């Protein structure tokens, strides 16, 4: 067992020794360039999704995550809250079931109010006037009504990364660039 340990130590020492001088080879392995440069590339590849978190790739995920929040906020302003909350939870995942699921509570709650609007003159219309009730039973206008609240919320998630990036960017170049400029000037002189 001791001979194997000694052999492993000698083998490790043999690989850690500098190479004999060859023409065109510096004689040692430059780990800072040959190993760390691919690591820097790999780290940059990993960091790019985080820097563009609020912008390109995760923007699609943010659309899907904001839809339930907005859809739950808009029905709270409606008169019938529980009917809207129950269908919106399964309708979050695909866009196709939103159209069949939305008219079902819309037909039960809004269609009788439209039929009774001539019978009940203003009190039935007043609570529904702030929200566009008449366009809601139409299916092409339903995707537009959730899209309008989503669009103002999309600029809000990118703002904190932008401010943090702006606060980091002025600090880093002020320290790094003058040092490189001075060394370049010294090399030129």
From Swiss-Prot:
Signal peptide: 1-16
Gene Ontology MF terms: calcium ion binding; identical protein binding; structural constituent of tooth enamel
Modified residues (Phosphoserine): 32
GO cellular component: collagen-containing extracellular matrix; extracellular region; supramolecular complex
Keywords linked to the UniProt accession: Biomineralization, Extracellular matrix, Phosphoprotein, Repeat, Secreted, Signal
The keyword Transport appears for this protein: no
Transmembrane keyword on record: no
Biased segments, Low complexity type: 92-107, 114-128, 141-151
Annotated stretches, region: Disordered: 87-167
GO process terms (BP): enamel mineralization
Cysteines paired by S-S bonds: none
Ranges of compositional bias, category Pro residues: 129-140, 152-161
Subcellular localization, as worded in the UniProt entry: Secreted, Extracellular space, Extracellular matrix
Post-translational modification: A number of other isoforms are produced by carboxy-terminal processing.
Pfam families: Amelogenin
Matches recorded under InterPro entries: Amelogenin
Physiological role: Plays a role in the biomineralization of teeth. Seems to regulate the formation of crystallites during the secretory stage of tooth enamel development. Thought to play a major role in the structural organization and mineralization of developing enamel.
Family named by the database record: Belongs to the amelogenin family.
Protein name: Amelogenin
UniProt lineage: Eukaryota, Metazoa, Chordata, Craniata, Vertebrata
Gene transcribed to yield this protein: AMEL
């Amino acid at each position: 067992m001791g001979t194997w340990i000694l052999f492993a130590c000698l083998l490790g020492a043999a690989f850690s020794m500098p190479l004999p001088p060859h023409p065109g080879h510096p004689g040692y392995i430059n780990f800072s360039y040959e190993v760390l440069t691919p690591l820097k590339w790999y780290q940059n590849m990993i960091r790019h999704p985080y820097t563009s978190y609020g912008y390109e790739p995760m923007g699609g995920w943010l659309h899907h995550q904001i839809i339930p929040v907005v859809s739950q906020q808009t029905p709270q302003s409606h008169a019938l809250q529980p009917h809207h909350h129950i269908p919106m939870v399964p309708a979050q995942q695909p866009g196709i079931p939103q159209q069949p699921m939305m008219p079902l509570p819309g037909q039960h709650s809004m269609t009788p109010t439209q039929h009774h609007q001539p019978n009940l003159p203003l009190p039935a219309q007043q609570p529904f006037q702030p929200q566009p009730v008449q366009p809601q039973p139409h299916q092409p206008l339903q995707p537009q009504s959730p899209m309008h609240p989503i669009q103002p919320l999309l600029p809000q998630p990118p703002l904190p990364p932008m401010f943090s990036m702006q606060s980091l960017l002025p600090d880093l170049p002020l320290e790094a660039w003058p040092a490189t400029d001075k060394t370049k000037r010294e090399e030129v002189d």
